[in-house]
């Protein structure tokens, strides 16, 4: 069950950039990546907090800014570069009755049992977890669900309480 609330004054919230580090070769504006656990080599690095700890495991981030500062790194042969990232908006599905642009919802994956469904990655998207509070940034189109569920493709932005 998705809980939904909406207010006319509620604008789509813009995510606040986070400063972190990424390999010099990967440091390209617009690049999206999934934050995964670090290597054992990272544990004693003095940059561990800014590089690893300020991002959440399993979330999808997008590089929105590049800074000129670079540092040596045991994992990246060309070192790491300071970048600005935001959590990426995630394409997903919601029941049609909840698909209202600007609405705030509590995300729950659809848990589709059809392993071969072409919409499975939308119904169970990477980067969102059950219980996440999200805002519907964009309502896209109705999904022709093979199991007959009344679903709509949307773009979700997780709401991070400051």
What is each of the regions a protein language model found here?
Residues 102-160:
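Long, low-complexity intrinsically disordered regions
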Residues 4, 39-55, 111-125:
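Cysteine-cluster motifs in flexible loop/terminal segments that predominantly coordinate metals
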Residues 42-45, 68-77, 141-150:
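Short, Lys/Arg- and Gly-enriched loop/turn segments at beta-strand edges
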Residues 2-24, 70-98:
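Extended boundary segments
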Residues 27-41, 104-114:
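Short, basic/aromatic beta-hairpin or loop at an interaction surface
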